[in-house]
């Protein structure tokens, strides 16, 4: 029998600077937003141009608010509504954790809708470019989850070479499901999105990339949920499903619908007048 790996006890705090504390999870968010901002700046310049660089810069604030507020509200509503209804002020205690990707996704969708309406942009065209970089942020977030020793997997056979004992989860070896998600929802999905986004014919069909992301994430998350331990306060749902899988069903349906609609509509080669790559 192979020796079982023991989860290394990482310090959840990345660095102390006087009274300032920067945690790995916060750094994952910051890195994802900043790198994503630079990549979206590049993507919107590809023909047909979807926005100006200045508009992408402005959207960074909207995206940050959408992710943080949506992620927090989603966690409260989807996972622990009774707890926060009884203790509403606990919703402000974000340092205790509790963020939902599905809530964050809804928050960003609202931010995209308001921002594109206010700036006279194509909602689907701009959303296509933004969703390409989202998996990168997901991957970084799951790595931060692993460093924090949270969201571990279900029990795994000790013969599995990468089975790992998480001290907070008991003595059983488990799947490091955070790393599965970082790989599938992060690296693999980002690679697929980036490759497809490079095709001009796809960029001329607004909504296809956004639909591909929704469907791709739903599939990747549903697979990873088969190895992830359900939240203790929810457990398994009917037919052995999890809350994460249930929330992925409407995402998958919406994704297929967007892709089908994009392919049935005539290609739209111009979303806004072409601008030089260095134009604001």
Curated annotation (Swiss-Prot):
The chain crosses the membrane at residues 59-79, 97-117, 207-227, 233-253. It is a multi-pass membrane protein. GO terms for cellular component: plasma membrane. It comes from the Bacteria. GO terms for molecular function: phosphatidylglycerol-prolipoprotein diacylglyceryl transferase activity. Keywords: Cell inner membrane, Cell membrane, Membrane, Transferase, Transmembrane, Transmembrane helix. Pathway: Protein modification; lipoprotein biosynthesis (diacylglyceryl transfer). Pfam families: LGT (PF01790). It is found in: Cell inner membrane. GO terms for biological process: lipoprotein biosynthetic process. A 1,2-diacyl-sn-glycero-3-phospho-(1'-sn-glycerol) binds at residue 142. Its EC number is 2.5.1.145. Belongs to the Lgt family. Catalyzes the transfer of the diacylglyceryl group from phosphatidylglycerol to the sulfhydryl group of the N-terminal cysteine of a prolipoprotein, the first step in the formation of mature lipoproteins. This is Phosphatidylglycerol--prolipoprotein diacylglyceryl transferase. It comes from Gluconacetobacter diazotrophicus (strain ATCC 49037 / DSM 5601 / CCUG 37298 / CIP 103539 / LMG 7603 / PAl5). The gene is lgt.
